[in-house]
């Protein structure tokens, strides 16, 4: 059996404080050990990114509910590129927002669909999974995997979802 090394948040309590979350959906550990938490799985979540030091001590947070740069509606996925930029899959806003590690907004990309998952490989190839686009939720987009450059945002390939009923929403 494994051993719990660290716990963030308070067991059995939800909230929007430094030591509470409301529906966290993703965690990323940076190369230096800092920990980023995407807190806000749906409309009732906190819609924020919370940053902790490697020892679990609170450092900062940013976000809030909305569609302006730096705000979120369901921050659902996190990834980091070789330059240390933090990519946030802002799913309900159908975009990826990019930040420095202090929370400064650097860019917003809307060409990767409605991102549910993000992965950036060592060559800065970005893989963004869209499991929710369909006629009702995100017209004009298709569920699948968007593949592109984490440096430029250029989408170079798309792998469609093999499910034949594109109007049946995923998770």
Describe these PLM feature segments.
Residues 1-171:
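Eukaryotic scaffold repeat domains enriched in small/polar residues
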């Amino acid at each position: 059996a494994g051993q719990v090394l660290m716990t963030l948040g308070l067991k059995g309590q939800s909230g929007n404080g430094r030591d509470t979350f409301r529906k966290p959906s993703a965690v990323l550990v940076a190369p230096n050990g800092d920990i980023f938490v995407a807190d806000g799985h749906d409309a009732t979540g906190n819609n924020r990114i919370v940053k902790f030091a490697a020892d679990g001590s609170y450092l900062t947070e940013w976000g809030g509910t909305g569609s302006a740069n730096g705000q979120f509606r369901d921050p659902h996925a996190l990834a980091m590129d070789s330059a240390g930029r933090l990519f946030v899959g802002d799913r309900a806003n159908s975009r990826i927002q990019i930040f420095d590690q202090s929370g400064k907004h650097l860019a917003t990309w809307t060409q990767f669909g409605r991102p549910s998952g993000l992965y950036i490989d060592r060559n800065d190839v970005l893989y963004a999974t869209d499991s929710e686009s369909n006629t009702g939720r995100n017209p004009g987009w298709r569920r699948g995997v968007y593949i592109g450059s984490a440096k430029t945002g250029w989408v170079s390939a798309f792998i469609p979802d093999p499910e034949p009923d594109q109007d049946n929403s995923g998770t």
